[in-house]
Design a protein with these regions (language model features):
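Membrane-interface extramembranous regions
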Residues: 1-105
Length: 105
């Protein structure tokens, strides 16, 4: 497999991890920041927008995993690349949103 397949799997993991908070907040009926809020990423979007945005992230991640390269759940390297993307999303997004929530930090 070529290197850009692994890069795509990292992006897939990022999309899958990013979809979780949007989807959960959406189906919980809570407002949550999204790219469609005003201002983008800072304002709060309605629950339906977040549920749909979460589903879109899941769809994008799923599509990348199964349409790019030759992904196999039995291949440790493939799964690790998706996990690395999810890990990077968790770290980057938690730092980003923590600094927005607490401007004094």
């Amino acid at each position: 497999m070529v290197w850009y397949d692994y890069l795509a799997y990292i992006f897939a993991g990022f999309f899958l991890a990013n979809g979780v908070p949007h989807f959960v907040q959406g189906i919980s009926g809570k407002k949550f920041p999204s790219p469609f809020a005003s201002p983008a990423g800072r304002g709060l979007s309605p629950p339906l927008v977040n549920a749909l945005w979460g589903l879109a992230n899941f769809f994008i991640g799923y599509t990348i995993i199964f349409k790019v390269g030759d992904f196999h759940f039995g291949m440790t390297r493939d799964v690790l690349m998706v996990g690395l993307g999810a890990f990077l999303a968790a770290v980057i997004l938690s730092i980003t949103f923590a600094s927005r929530a607490n401007p004094d930090s």
